[in-house]
Amino acid sequence: MSNHKEFSEALKVIPGGVDSPVRAFKNVGSEPFMVQKGKGAYIYDIEGNKYLDFVQSWGPLIFGHADKDIQDAVIKTAKSGLSFGASSPLETKLAKLILSKFDWLDKIRFVSSGTEATMSAIRLARGFSGKDKIIKFEGCYHGHSDSLLVKAGSGATTFGSSSSAGVPEDTAKNTYLAIYNDIDSVKNIVEKEDIGTIIIEPIAGNMGLVPADKEFLIKLRKICDEKKIVLILDEVMSGFRAGELGSYGIYGIKGDIVTFGKVIGGGMNVAAFAGKKEIMDMISPLGPVYQAGTLSGNPVSMAAGIASLTKIFASRNLYTKLENLANMFMIGLKNIAKNHGIAIQVAVRGSMFGYFFTDKAVKNYNDALSADTKMFAKFHSGMIKEGIFLAPSQFETGFICDAMSEKEINFALKKANKVFDEISKDSAKKANKTKICSKKTVKKSVKNKK
């Protein structure tokens, strides 16, 4: 069956044909391919086409597709049962592995998705602080729970309004919007409102890759300390991706609560939130903050997470290799674009990378919105045709995996050069056509005057 036909069938029974909106490729104006399998750095569609994959399931697959060690752990555990609805030693083992890297985090609880992790972290922070009002930052995505699906109101100091149908305005009104990398926007809100919680992606990966400035995070931490505000660092994406210590290894900033996901599950549905003992002990059954989940901590997912982190901790120079490849890709892409007269900004944090077609530095959501999305769509479509799978949205992040080498990066850059060549030629043709049409219009106008 063809990609088109299979997607057409999906459209009949699944809203939009997908189970997560970005997979529909609407942001780049094309139709998605349907995946048959993945192996290492590559995925294959149902037509047999092969793609070098820089999406890597949106981050979890740091060792690439179908990693043998992780697969073996999953298969072995699955033979004993998929889920028990009771605790197993695997939960404790994975908890200890994660906490061993963060000496200020005392306890952790597992859930099944990043949305659950941030939603639970917000509830926990509110329960601990006794305050309902929170601050989030424009462009930071923390899952699709109601209180976090907000957009800016009439200004940075106003409360948010819902950005999705079905979210009550009263729910959104307890969420205030600040500007990423702008500490004054935070101060303006904190001075006027009784804020109990601030949540942030220290390395924003959902408006494209936009890292926080270190000085901004230092000042944010200081405000939280002075005002006794609970600071949640959302590291669902950046945890064990930007480095073994996530954002902490880069900035040295400690969150009161930290959320994890993606890599800690090795490709299975695992996320978590962790914090200091006095905060975490507020969760039931110890405290009054309720949180539960049927499949939370299921043994198969725990086994995948243990295998993933064990392999990470045993891999010497893993993150150095991944960051070198990410820099090689982004620096190369920037140089190629420059040679074609195309404005581009690039960013790298560990194995994460992003690019914007703009000549302006991207520091926040408004900067990201000003980038040339039409150029992005052209580039993405061209790369797909050349067998390179990049995130099908300007507002997503790309990922390097351990199965890649300089060979794959050079291949991707070679294809990028070809795509930019075609874009430049197409632009030149259109410009020439416009010029000819303009001359004809002028001649016709002169003739009519005579």
Curated annotation (Swiss-Prot):
Gene Ontology CC annotations of this record: cytoplasm
Family: Belongs to the class-III pyridoxal-phosphate-dependent aminotransferase family. HemL subfamily.
Cofactor(s) the protein requires to work: pyridoxal 5'-phosphate
Keywords: Cytoplasm, Isomerase, Porphyrin biosynthesis, Pyridoxal phosphate
Primary location recorded for the protein, binned into one broad class: cytoplasm
Positions in coiled-coil regions: none
Protein name, as recorded: Glutamate-1-semialdehyde 2,1-aminomutase
Pathway where it operates: Porphyrin-containing compound metabolism; protoporphyrin-IX biosynthesis; 5-aminolevulinate from L-glutamyl-tRNA(Glu): step 2/2
EC number(s) stated in the UniProt entry for this protein: 5.4.3.8
MF term (GO), any: pyridoxal phosphate binding
